């Protein structure tokens, strides 16, 4: 008893779905029959659906429709091939976009408009590349030439970089072998060089000129030259400072900062 109740419950649940499926199939078959006939008025669509569902005792219209459907079955593969052909069109467009890249992005709207204005016939599909070349002129050729020029320019840049690196390496090798060229190029700044006697004399002169500025020494010989050059400015400044003989008395009065730096502050 419980199994019977369960079966009835399942039938009640699945019944509306099955009826809807049967109705949909019947209406689709009857619509196909009326479409296949030269004169659709020869078949009553409502009567055909009701006979298919079993609501009418007469089955004349439904039998005629079934015979027509059986005769039209060989024509279905042709429809299937047309659908396959329609599905293959997006794949072909995807391959074209993948192949020509920037050209499709640049001139895509123009090509689409041309396709709408001048649709391609089935006989012309075999020679698609020639027709594209004739239809779109030199656009595709120009794009290919641009790609070739970019590739050539990148190769040329690589060659220039490689030659520059080789030249720099050879130059460094020659510079390591020849120390005189390095000294001429960098002037001894990059590495320490042995000074000639002439350079030693110049260094001594520089030491004499600026050395006493950092330590307490007497007035140099070139004091008169500076005196002539700067007029009475240095003279007035020197007169304002105490002499060396008065250093002891002056050291008692000067601040501790002047004691620390000595002649640097007094000069």
From Swiss-Prot:
Molecular-function annotations in GO: neuropeptide hormone activity; opioid peptide activity
Site (Cleavage): 111-113, 133-134, 214-216, 218-219
Keyword Secreted recorded: yes
Region (Disordered): 163-182
Localization, UniProt: Cytoplasmic vesicle, Secretory vesicle, Chromaffin granule lumen; Secreted
Family matches, as InterPro entries: Opioid_neupept, Proenkphlin_A
Keyword presence, Disulfide bond: yes
Post-translational modification Phosphoserine, affected residues: 251
Gene Ontology CC terms: axon terminus; cell body fiber; chromaffin granule lumen; dendrite; endoplasmic reticulum lumen; extracellular region; neuronal cell body; neuronal dense core vesicle lumen
Predominant location category: cytoplasm
S-S bridge residues: 26-48, 30-52, 33-65
One Gene Ontology term from the biological process aspect of the record: cellular response to cAMP
Residues excised as propeptide: 196-207, 217-227
PANTHER family registered for this protein in UniProt: PROENKEPHALIN, PROENKEPHALIN-A
Similarity comment: Belongs to the opioid neuropeptide precursor family.
Protein name per its UniProtKB record: Proenkephalin-A
Organism: Homo sapiens (Human)
